[in-house]
Amino acid sequence: MGNILRKGQQIYLAGDMKKQMLLNKDGTPKRKVGRPGRKRIDSEAKSRRTAQNRAAQRAFRDRKEAKMKSLQERVELLEQKDAQNKTTTDFLLCSLKSLLSEITKYRAKNSDDERILAFLDDLQEQQKRENEKGTSTAVSKAAKELPSPNSDENMTVNTSIEVQPHTQENEKVMWNIGSWNAPSLTNSWDSPPGNRTGAVTIGDESINGSEMPDFSLDLVSNDRQTGLEALDYDIHNYFPQHSERLTAEKIDTSACQCEIDQKYLPYETEDDTLFPSVLPLAVGSQCNNICNRKCIGTKPCSNKEIKCDLITSHLLNQKSLASVLPVAASHTKTIRTQSEAIEHISSAISNGKASCYHILEEISSLPKYSSLDIDDLCSELIIKAKCTDDCKIVVKARDLQSALVRQLL
């Protein structure tokens, strides 16, 4: 085998054996391992890495599926909004056309009316073409072509949407309505009936919207009155296409006075209390009543929700006032003046006896008010009212107080 040379802990084999062996501390050679620099494969670590890779892939697929689901929901929401916008646009177009047709009954048709009608026709034609193209179906088709979570990641998706080029026709349809100014309308009440047509002044006939005259509507007469008080005369229409005579007469309100009989006025019940004992009938600092500018109550308004059976029965259940209001007491006193009614209501509030029926009894006894006034009061209150869990209509005390001041007192 050749000579053996010992040098430290190493043994060098001479001759044919040129192998190197390491010895332990006790002189025994160490166990031979594989190639130097390589580690033994750990099957447990390999299985752990495989499980981690599978978990990462599964999480990626879940995130991708959630993203696709959210995109589909957004597409559906946009489609619903688009359909709602189209419905609203159609309704506004029809309303505008009907409004123009009504206006032409009272004045002559001018070039601006024809221009608006032409614009509406073009807009309807454009919407019809868009509906035929089916833009909504194109969006849904693009959503269907999106890859599923189990499909190939390298697959390309065509999500392009066709866009119409900007042409002169589109520019005509997108004509700005805000830049158009209607002709000037001026009311001349002092002119004779034969000269009433002179109140409408037609502006320039130019089609350019920027050169149109400004729109001004002046409905103030010479005596500075507005509303129905200034319409105490006949209005005649002298247009040749409408030869019928239109007459506006003053309404006689004497027949509607005191329509609520005293026998239907109520007695006070504990459950029908509409006002708390300290609720005023006028808004704190803005005590500016029509009734002699007199404040009713001393403490500020309350936000307490008060049940109002009158609105529940009269408006929602479609019951008449005679059936809603119970029979009044025999000692009910008829009040003739508004100041007396205010004094009675003030005393009732100060004594803590104010109720819904008590207020109606005081108000309906006045010749100035009728069931129509009570309907107006209910119509204003129902805007700010809300329904409770027990199907009762409640109104805040502050809203009720301001409604009484505006509508009745």
From Swiss-Prot:
UniProt keyword annotation of Transcription present: yes
PTM per Swiss-Prot/TrEMBL: Depending on the oxidative stress inducing agent, CAD1/YAP2 can undergo two distinct conformational changes, both through oxidation of cysteine residues, and both masking the nuclear export signal, thus abolishing nuclear export by CRM1/exportin 1. Peroxide stress induces the formation of possible intramolecular disulfide bonds as well as intermolcular disulfide within a homodimer. Cadmium may bind directly to specific cysteine residues (Cys-391 and either Cys-356 or Cys-387) in the c-CRD.
Disruption phenotype: Hypersensitive to the cytotoxic metal cadmium.
Region annotation Basic motif: where it falls in the sequence: 46-69
Annotated consequence of substituting C391A: Does not accumulate in the nucleus in response to cadmium
PANTHER family: AP-1-LIKE TRANSCRIPTION FACTOR YAP1-RELATED, TRANSCRIPTION FACTOR KAPC-RELATED
UniProt function note: Transcription activator involved in oxidative stress response and cadmium resistance. Regulates the transcription of genes overrepresented for the function of stabilizing proteins including the inducible Hsp90-family protein HSP82. Preferentially binds to promoters with the core binding site 5'-TTA[CG]TAA-3'. Activity of the transcription factor is controlled through oxidation of specific cysteine residues resulting in the alteration of its subcellular location. Activation by alkyl hydroperoxides or cadmium induces nuclear accumulation and as a result CAD1/YAP2 transcriptional activity.
Oligomer and partners: Homodimer; disulfide-linked, upon oxidation. Interacts in the nucleus with the nuclear export protein CRM1. Interacts with RCK1.
Record's protein name: AP-1-like transcription factor YAP2
Organism of this sequence: Saccharomyces cerevisiae (strain ATCC 204508 / S288c) (Baker's yeast)
Primary gene name: CAD1
